[in-house]
Amino acid sequence: IEEITELLDIAPLLSRHPFDLSGGEQQKCAIAKIMLSEPRILLLDEPTKGFDAHSKQNLSEILKKLKARGITVVTVTHDIEFAAENADRCGLFFDGEIISSATPNEFFGGNSFYTTAAGRISRFVFKNAVTVEQVVEMCKRSGKND
């Protein structure tokens, strides 16, 4: 329990009533509870629903820690920005089947409709830049700072 508490940074929440926790804090506690069973695969359905930017960043850090421990995380989400920043692979379900699957850069970079805001803004300048961080890095490398 102590290891998971530290991993998810929830020690300050342990003495609080669940009804007094924010949505993001409840989500972290739910992940902690699941982690007690030592899963090899974690299935998350819309994990960022109702999250603010700070909570999404916290969840992103948690997912990276889980990945570093060898845990596979499968996420179903409509949060394209979150998927582009955190996924190793992205897929599109339609009529019960995966009709497209690729790395985030290939998936979102080559897509006109299902893409990120950064991808839409930069598509005619940088090929396959789908996150803000990628656009900033490409601007720095190309000298396009304006």
Which residues make up each language-model segment?
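Catalytic Walker B motif of ABC-type/P-loop ATPase nucleotide-binding domains
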Residues: L42-D45
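H-loop/switch region of ABC-family ATPase nucleotide-binding domains
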Residues: T77-H78
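Conserved ABC ATPase signature
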Residues: H17-L21, E25
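Conserved ABC ATPase "signature" region
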Residues: I1-L13
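ABC ATPase nucleotide-binding domains
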Residues: Y114-D146
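A short, surface-exposed alpha-helical micro-motif characterized by mixed small hydrophobic
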Residues: A83-E85
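Conserved beta-strand-loop-alpha-helix hinge in the C-terminal portion
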Residues: E97-I121
